[in-house]
């Protein structure tokens, strides 16, 4: 049995395995703990003024202010920590609910930073900023300004990573205090380093202008005390093909296509053609279409034939009511009737 093409394609699609899903990266224990603490802190903020009358009476201070440290408030905060469908959040909360209650009841005043107490010291899931790894070692450059403030410490704030510096653009070195090629040191002392970009003409530099170049970038050359652009388009051998023209840009050049009417060119448009393609001629300084139908010598040779100009050429067409016959004549089809006679005009 032969299936029709559409049915065969449909059957093939049914048999193909479904596309593999790209596995999303699961949050780390530190990220989960931090998210839980953020929700807890938000819950504290949301309930901070609840059940307070806003006055200053002794009764409010004695009775209503008890809510601030109450288990009722804690319960309201806890109920808003995890969405019902967030399994990992609910699992983490269930495992450590008693510890959060203990912090609320007895440790809150002594250790007001819940993240530091819960995620760093209790669960040992995270590290303080500026430290990394299983033992929360200091990042390169110290915990106060890791990587000299010019990079990111690998594993910063987590129990992972190796503490190495991933430098920001413009910086290099193990502590991110040295400047990359294309940058120079605007400020540097024992604690700070600030690198800024060189002029575009410099590969390396000691200052912000083209006169501060130590080495010129490719496409630039030193003239006296500064790096200046090389005009590649002025080279003895042009860098572009015969059907292109060259445009110089800072540090480089581009090759652009000549106008479609040109045979070789020196710039953009039909006014910059070296020569014109067939069917075009120089008119008022640029290549323009030749109207062959207006020439003194007829280009359409057949009798009754009409000439129509086209860009770069022309067409010869028999008018309506005429047909082109085998003798290269335009025969009036309206007069080809009766007694086998054909009324045609013949060329001399």
From Swiss-Prot:
Signal peptide per UniProt: 1-22
SMART domains: EGF, EGF_CA, FU
Protein role: Protein disulfide isomerase. Might play a role in the unfolded protein response. May regulate transport of alpha4-beta2 neuronal acetylcholine receptor.
EC number: 5.3.4.1
Protein name in UniProt: Protein disulfide isomerase CRELD2
Disulphide-bonded residues: 30-33, 139-153, 147-165, 167-176, 262-265, 293-307, 300-316, 318-328
Lineage of the species this protein comes from: Eukaryota, Metazoa, Chordata, Craniata, Vertebrata
Cellular localisation: Endoplasmic reticulum
GO molecular function: calcium ion binding; protein disulfide isomerase activity
